[in-house]
Regions:
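Cys/His-rich metal-chelating microdomains
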Residues: 31-32, 188
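Cys/His/Pro-rich metal-binding microdomains
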Residues: 26, 43, 76, 183, ...
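Long compositionally biased, domain-poor regions of proteins
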Residues: 165-172, 180-183, 188-191, 195, ...
Length: 251
């Protein structure tokens, strides 16, 4: 275990799972819940929200626009055999943790040359650069530590120039009626409100995927209809800008 001083003792379902069909939560989401660009940051999410998402996976009301992606496929699969008691235990644990700032957002027209390392982008390290285009490219600052499940891993998220200003206007003001101010539901500091999750400081790759899934009917569980209305008038560049701005904030 990397940093046992960073978190309370791990419940069995987080540390070991339940063989043969329930993976350890901490393997993918790390011991204190930060996850990575490929999946969710669970640290500090409301307990009721985590439980609801597991229910949505199980009932088929939380799916993905890319059905072949491994992380959501695993979540849908393990939502069937995992017990309600294990979900309750994991949700209690992760909701008790404090999220950490781990993402630096950099606006740029070009980025270090990249390749796909498993489920994430990684830097080739050759000194070459490539155009960013209309993408978010989120790279572990130390790939080996990230792949070794270090929960203190940090990331650099490259976003197109102008994303932060545009995203800030959409998030804080609704973009002149294009959407709803995020603080309306997610709290004045965007760190959550009641059963609704904090969205400040979250992975921009992950947030973009969720906005896209809400907008295309792949998330239809509780509260999802409200989000579908929020993203209804947004195009992908708007979603990218929102995700970039949110990632730049302290969680």
């Amino acid at each position: 275990m990397w940093h046992p001083e960073d978190h309370p003792p791990l419940p069995d379902v987080v540390a070991s799972g339940r063989k043969p069909d329930v993976l350890a939560c901490g393997f993918c989401h790390r011991a204190d819940g930060p996850g990575g660009p490929e999946n969710a940051d669970l640290a500090g999410l409301p307990k009721t929200y985590i439980i609801q998402q597991m229910s949505d996976f199980k009932r088929g009301t939380r799916r993905t626009a890319a059905p072949g992606r491994l992380p959501p496929t695993l979540m849908i699969g393990l939502s069937k055999p995992i017990t309600d008691a294990d979900v309750e235990t994991a949700a209690t644990y992760f909701s008790s943790l404090r999220p950490r700032k781990r993402i630096q957002v950099v606006e740029s027209d070009s980025i270090p040359k990249t390749y796909i390392a498993g489920l994430v982008w990684a830097e080739v390290g050759s000194g070459e650069r490539e155009p960013l285009g209309d993408r978010i490219i989120e790279i572990p600052d130390d790939l080996i530590r990230f792949e070794s499940r270090d929960p203190r891993s940090t990331f650099t998220a490259y976003v197109p120039v102008g994303s932060l200003e545009k995203g800030g206007a959409l998030v804080t003001k609704g973009g002149a009626g294009k959407t709803v101010q995020c603080a309306t539901c997610h709290g004045p500091d965007l760190k959550g409100l009641g059963p609704l999750p904090g969205i400040a400081g979250r992975s921009p790759s992950y947030v973009f995927r969720q906005l896209y899934d809400f907008g295309h009917g792949h998330r239809t569980g509780e509260w999802s209809p409200l989000m579908a209305q929020v993203v209804n008038n947004l195009d992908q560049n708007d979603m990218l800008a929102i995700a970039a701005y949110l990632a730049s904030l302290d969680p």
